[in-house]
Amino acid sequence: MTASAIGTTSNWTPLEAKLAPELCAEFMWMYRDRGVEHYKHIQTRRYLRLDSVGRCMARQGDSFYEIPFDDEWKWVSGRSEGEENAIA
């Protein structure tokens, strides 16, 4: 990963398209790496990674691959099955 590949201007659009505003408030935008926005949950400290069209991504080594949003949201937010997740 090179310094030029890291974006430092926040982009909330992908997260706002997936979650209600009160749930977006649970995250901090951290950085963009190769088109993937990295949002850190304020309680769990886990990352939710979304690309520009809202696909949820996971990191494996230096690569990203797509994963189901609902599953990742539950893990990142610490919510369990059956809890209200208010996905937009």
Predicted feature descriptions by range:
Residues 2-20, 60-88:
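Mixed-charge, Lys/Arg-enriched low-complexity segments
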Residues 24-71:
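Acidic, low-complexity, intrinsically disordered interaction modules
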